[in-house]
């Protein structure tokens, strides 16, 4: 979908720098080039030329590049002027370009939007551009690059292909009911459906990990009063973020700290001690604590290793786990190793990671840091996954829900028409991720968050 408009924007950050770039895209790009450099540019040839004002005055000199449609980032004719990075010089050159009739300033993200509309990128790849620019760690940058190269989109397209294949099979069974073989009951459709559910679950798990890399992992510290939750928050934050006393119930409200471990973002949340409180303010704090726990990506359950009654610790753990939603991962921390004599360590016990440490002396805290880093998907190699956004997770979640509904329609009600409709809905949700089925409002929200010039 080629636009009739020609847009221009500064592609390098505002301010002074060694190099400044102005990017022009649209049908008037070559006309702009002729107006500025007074020469017809050959595609993909670098030209070192003076950049001239309307009266012929030289504004700057630098490199002019021409990318002819469709072999450009946007799929349109694109011209770049690469000159000196002084903001005054760039503003003068921008003013000159805007004097060409029909050229206007680009909106934020409009170059990427044109690339999407011209099928140079799908929506997930376009979003990956912004994620690559904003990556806060090497791992996030590598994963964003994989998304930009189409890794995430490839997985989504494979799911869509599987859905289309299954839809075709189901609708054929509906259209030819008089065949000797009952295709809805022979087990093949159910087998394909179960395979599809498994494929989707795997992609959802990878997308969840990718979302954590992008947005950060929410870690809630929970446990009984005086277990050392606030001390652990301070140890992880590297500062006295929370008040620490020997008085049980000191923390009444939720405390939040945003930290980075090797560039990986974490949102650490300290909560009120969990117990049967009589004080109204403390009860409110405990309610808020549970609200945070239920929304966590991971929970650190703090236990006081100096408690002489091991059964009491086991009971505290059992009570907590019985109230916890089953899909939230838990790390158990046995605190106060400096007082109990336990050696700082990390091990797996009964399906949980158990870490022994002292939040007060910070002995063993490095073990917890490394564990949290690995939980976020940190990898020491060069290979990474892909980045995902919250809207991607929501679309995958909706798709999974409708696959489960479809399985019920097939196995319990033998309703092929209803299964076919659920598969159509699943295909639409998956299409939202790559932009095959996306509202204009959503597109506007996505691209408006980009930098101008991208």
From Swiss-Prot:
Binding site for GTP: 226-231, 245-251, 270-273
Residues that coordinate or bind Mg(2+): 230, 251
Domain TrmE-type G intervals: 216-377
The UniProt record lists the keyword Cell division: no
SUPFAM superfamilies noted in UniProt: P-loop containing nucleoside triphosphate hydrolases (SSF52540), TrmE connector domain (SSF116878)
Pfam entry (one): TrmE_N
Subcellular location: Cytoplasm
Single annotated GO MF: GTPase activity
EC assignment: 3.6.-.-
Binding site for K(+): 226, 245, 247, 250
Protein name in UniProt: tRNA modification GTPase MnmE
Protein species of origin: Mannheimia succiniciproducens (strain KCTC 0769BP / MBEL55E)
Source organism phylogeny: Bacteria, Pseudomonadati, Pseudomonadota, Gammaproteobacteria, Pasteurellales
């Amino acid at each position: 979908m080629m636009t009739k408009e020609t847009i221009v924007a500064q592609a390098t950050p505002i301010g002074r720098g060694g190099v400044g770039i102005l990017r022009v895209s649209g049908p008037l790009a070559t006309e702009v080039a002729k107006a500025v450099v007074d020469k017809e540019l050959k595609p993909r040839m670098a030209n070192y030329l003076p950049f001239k004002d309307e009266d012929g005055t030289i504004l700057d000199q630098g490199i002019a590049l021409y990318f002819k449609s469709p072999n450009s980032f946007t799929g349109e004719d694109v011209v770049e002027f690469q000159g000196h990075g002084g903001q005054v010089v760039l503003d003068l050159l921008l003013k000159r370009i805007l004097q060409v009739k029909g050229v206007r300033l680009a909106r934020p993200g409009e170059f990427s939007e044109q690339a999407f509309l011209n099928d140079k990128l799908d929506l997930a790849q376009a979003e990956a551009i912004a994620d690559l620019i904003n990556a806060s760690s090497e791992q996030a940058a590598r994963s964003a690059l994989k998304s930009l190269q189409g890794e995430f989109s490839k997985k989504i397209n494979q799911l869509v292909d599987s859905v289309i294949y299954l839809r075709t099979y189901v609708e054929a069974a509906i259209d030819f009911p008089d065949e000797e073989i009952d295709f809805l009951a022979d087990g093949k459709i159910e087998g394909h459906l179960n395979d599809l559910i498994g494929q989707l679950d795997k992609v959802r798990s990878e997308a969840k990990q990718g979302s954590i890399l992008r947005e950060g992992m929410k870690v809630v510290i929970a446990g009984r009063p005086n277990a050392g939750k606030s001390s652990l928050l301070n140890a992880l934050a590297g500062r006295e973020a929370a008040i620490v006393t020997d008085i049980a119930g000191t923390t009444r409200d939720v405390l939040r700290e945003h930290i980075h471990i090797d560039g990986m973002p974490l949102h650490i949340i300290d909560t009120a001690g969990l117990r049967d409180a009589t004080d109204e303010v403390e009860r409110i704090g405990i309610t808020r604590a549970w609200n945070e726990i239920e929304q966590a990506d991971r929970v650190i359950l703090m236990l006081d290793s100096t408690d002489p009654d091991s059964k009491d610790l086991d009971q505290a753990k059992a009570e907590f786990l019985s109230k916890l939603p089953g899909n939230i991962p838990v790390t158990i921390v046995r605190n106060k190793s400096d007082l109990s004599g336990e050696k700082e360590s990390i091990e797996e016990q009964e399906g949980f990671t158990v870490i022994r440490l002292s939040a007060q002396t910070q002995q063993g805290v490095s073990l917890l840091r490394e564990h949290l880093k690995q939980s976020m998907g940190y990898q020491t190699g060069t290979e990474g996954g892909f980045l995902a956004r919250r809207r991607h997770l929501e679309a995958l979640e909706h798709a999974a829900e409708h696959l489960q509904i479809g399985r019920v329609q097939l196995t319990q009600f033998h309703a092929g028409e209803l299964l076919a409709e659920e598969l159509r809905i699943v295909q639409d949700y998956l299409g939202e991720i790559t932009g095959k089925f996306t509202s204009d409002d959503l597109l506007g929200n996505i691209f408006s968050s980009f930098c101008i010039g991208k």
